[in-house]
Amino acid sequence: MPEKKITKAIVCPMCGEMSKADVYTSINPSVTKGVRRRALDGELFAWKCPSCGYSARLTYPILYNDMKNRFMVYFIPKIDHFQLCDKELEEKYSNLRNISKRIVPSFNSFKEKIFIFESGLDDMSVELTKLAISQTVSKKLGGAEIHDGYLSMYDRERNTMGFTYFTGEKHTPHVQTARLEIYVKSKKIVDSLAYKDKKLKGFLKIDREWAENILYRYKRMKHIEKLNKLKE
């Protein structure tokens, strides 16, 4: 699938003048040279008013289709659905298997998913790892609230991965690294409890809320196992 774009009318919020902008609905880094960089650094979403020079970053639905690495990330601003089925895409790629398909609500999560899949990682396991480490970070910072967190570093040779969390009232960034053993443990939990999710069709929203549900089920399972042992 090559890139697809449409032209839309844009009204400048500063001067009120109307102009046009190219809006990309689908991009494929394997086909279009340089589009990956333009997507990740925000250039693809940049817009400048030709009348007054006001600059802004447009936010609109866009499908990032990386067939080389076999994943699709659908950025739909502020989407709150867990699952999105696109019949046209499902039919078009019905002969392809093992393609990870995700929906994300923000530009940062869009970039993170691309980084995760390009690194050859399982995003479900990454989300569970991120959640577990965020609890450690919160305790480390005296119970500070953790607002968001993103995978920001992965080094397989050094057996390390790192996350950047935004903490406290000022959303202060905090970088926390961890050994890959935590990720490996998370993957075992995911393989045990999320096997049904892995079989679902369409685009899935795998995020903190999803990870919290998996962690809750895991703790409940362990609690039941403990009670059963006491009864023996």
Positions of PLM-derived features:
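Weak global preference for isoleucine
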Residues: 6, 10, 27, 62, ...
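Domain-exit/linker segments immediately C-terminal to small folded modules
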Residues: 48-133
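Serine/threonine-rich low-complexity intrinsically disordered regions
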Residues: 28-32, 85-86, 122, 176, ...
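N-terminal cysteine/histidine-rich coordination modules
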Residues: 1-78
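Arginine residue identity/basic-tract feature
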Residues: 4-5, 36-38, 57, 70, ...
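Long C-terminal interaction/binding lobes of large macromolecular proteins
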Residues: 42-45, 90, 126-232
